Amino acid sequence: MGISANLFVNQKGTTTALKQPKEIGYYSRNQTEEYLVSDDINLRYYYLPDQEIEHGIDLSAGASKFRDVAKDFKDRCSLKGLLDTLMEYEKKKNKKSNVDIITFRGIMSKLIRASMEPPNFNKVDLRIVSYDGQLFIKDVSDYNAATNESNSSGVNSRQQAGTSRQQIDTYTGYKFEGIATLDKPLPYVEREVIEKRPRKILNNGDEYITVVRTGVGECKVVLGAEIDCIFDFKEEGKDNLKHYTELKCSSQISTTNDVRRFEKKMFRAWLQCFLVGVPRVIYGFRDDQYMLKTVEEFSTEEIPVIIKANNPTLGQSCLDAIKWYGLFTDWLLKIIPREQSGNIRAYRLVYENNHLRLSEIEEQDGEYSRYVLEDGILTPEFKEWRESLRVPSEETPKAD
């Protein structure tokens, strides 16, 4: 019988030791589902002068023309770009990276938030494969259940019922990114391009993803994370985490309830940025008519202080999140065997009621072939690369 285990989310961890995030690579994904390693073609640059806001920016403009290309992707949660980037990094060093877990920031964020959000609000439906001494984790949630972490819930402009208010609320996030960024540094952009930003048709297919090595406690992690833009400039050939920025859009704050809702949004934004070392969040605030009214910048490291000053209970959640991060990663590493071999074992990890439930996918299971024998998570190229590192030699290189 396969492995099965539960982790109750009310447990409290003690680990607060964190590893400094370090960028080890990046890639771009385009509208045709291509993954371009070490290509920053989809990296954006922040530029939104005050006078543009004063002239009035309608964040709902163009919602009916939004191109929801991600819904047609063959595998929109694919690890291919992440694995290809990790493989390129390892080839430069000619050795396997010394890490325990490889996944996306959004998945790690979901798992952390499971300790403070119910499963109907935070759907966790993951598949894990244990291979070559490491765990590779993929989100297999339905498209409509995607969280706002990845900005991939989409706005389907093709629905016959038209564009709902909820869809427009989602769209304003894309719109804010569209009007606040450029595809090149400002000196290389023509004035005409800047002026046409409000009329640009947007899509959810183009992304720029950083690949970061980080960790908590004894667990070493590689995370892929979508980056909204560069705040100032990019340093070629260097770690650019300090230059990256998260962009968010929210309704204006008028009531006490608005304050509480925004504090929860800030916590999630902090968690996103904290996990991969993004140092700032820029919020655009809209009124009830979706007009952009103000823009405010927050330092990631100051957000817990801001939250705690207004809401001590929620402020404690930042520290609790780190402790839970350490607890559940340690649990995964202890429960799931990690053989230093080419053997693959697959598992389900779901969030039910008050616990995370892990169960092994056995040979008679309908998903076994996809995740163990085929490329449901691991690509043939990545497995071939790792197999090449196991070819006997006079001296086996140490892991990075």
Curated annotation (Swiss-Prot):
Q: How does it assemble?
A: Interacts with RAT1; the interaction is direct, stabilizes RAT1 protein structure and stimulates its exoribonuclease activity. The interaction also stimulates RAI1 pyrophosphohydrolase activity, probably by recruiting it to mRNA substrates.
Cofactor dependence is on: a divalent metal cation
The keyword Electron transport appears for this protein: no
Pfam families cross-referenced by the UniProt entry:
RAI1
Q: How many cofactor units bind, and how?
A: Divalent metal cation.
Q: Which residues form a coiled coil?
A: none
Primary location class: nucleus
Domain of life, per the record?
Eukaryota
The top EC class is: hydrolase
> Under what name is this protein listed?
Decapping nuclease RAI1
Signal sequence span is none
Q: What is the lineage of its organism?
A: Eukaryota, Fungi, Dikarya, Ascomycota, Saccharomycotina
Name a biological process GO annotation. Answer: NAD-cap decapping
Q: Which InterPro entries match?
A: RAI1, RAI1-like_fam
Residues binding substrate: 226, 248, 272
Location relative to the cell: Nucleus
Annotated S-S bridges: none
Q: What does the UniProt function comment say about this protein?
A: Decapping enzyme for NAD-capped RNAs: specifically hydrolyzes the nicotinamide adenine dinucleotide (NAD) cap from a subset of RNAs by removing the entire NAD moiety from the 5'-end of an NAD-capped RNA. The NAD-cap is present at the 5'-end of some RNAs and snoRNAs. In contrast to the canonical 5'-end N7 methylguanosine (m7G) cap, the NAD cap promotes mRNA decay. Also acts as a non-canonical decapping enzyme that removes the entire cap structure of m7G capped or incompletely capped RNAs.
The answer to whether the entry has keyword Thylakoid is no
Q: Identify a single GO molecular function assigned to this protein.
A: RNA binding
Q: Where does a divalent metal cation bind?
A: 177, 228, 246-247
Write down the EC number: 3.6.1.-
The record's comment on protein family reads: Belongs to the DXO/Dom3Z family.
Keywords, in A-Z order: Hydrolase, Metal-binding, mRNA processing, Nuclease, Nucleotide-binding, Nucleus, RNA-binding
